[in-house]
A protein has these predicted regions:
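Predominantly soluble domains enriched in secretory-pathway, periplasmic, or organellar proteins
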Residues: 1-153
Length: 153
């Protein structure tokens, strides 16, 4: 789930749906739905073969709130989506992209590529991958955090 900077809109995914929804907290209603591409091979799969009932799993927002990054788990891609137009730029990242989170500075989307033991780093501005980081076995949920260092007495 991703919350817009103004606190009015939430973006979320649902099992077996290849895309996401925009929910308006003031109107208390879904106001838009984004359908993202589904590869032909995935269209032929029975739903029982979807990893953890997830067509897409993982959504995050750029630091300026202008773009979303969506992990297309069953489709092997991440999509950078313009929040106003819902125009999507699909980036092939590998097998089973499972989660997405935003870098601390808001400039990059980190997508775990669970079947390839790595995290793809995608630039929100350029809508391109800029790095691939090898990590431990089968990464799933990734988070960005900040630590406050307190000097020892």
């Amino acid at each position: 789930m991703a919350l817009a900077p103004d606190g009015r809109f939430i973006y979320f995914q649902m099992s077996f749906f290849h895309g996401f929804f925009e929910f308006d907290l003031e109107r208390k209603a879904i106001v838009r739905r984004a359908e993202l591409p589904v590869p032909d091979a995935v269209k032929k799969l029975p739903l029982a073969r979807y990893q953890l009932n997830s067509a897409h799993h993982g959504i995050t927002m750029s630091g300026d709130g202008g773009k979303l990054c969506v992990a297309g788990t069953m489709s092997g891609y991440a999509a950078i989506v313009d929040r106003k137009t819902f125009q999507a730029h699909v980036i092939q990242v590998g097998e089973k992209p499972y989660w997405a989170t935003t870098s601390a500075d808001g400039r990059f989307c980190y997508v775990s590529v669970s079947s390839e033991d790595r995290v793809a780093v995608i630039s929100f501005a350029d809508e391109k991958p800029v790095a691939s980081i090898r990590v431990g076995d089968h990464p799933q949920r990734v988070r960005t955090g900040k630590m406050r260092m307190i000097p020892a007495p």
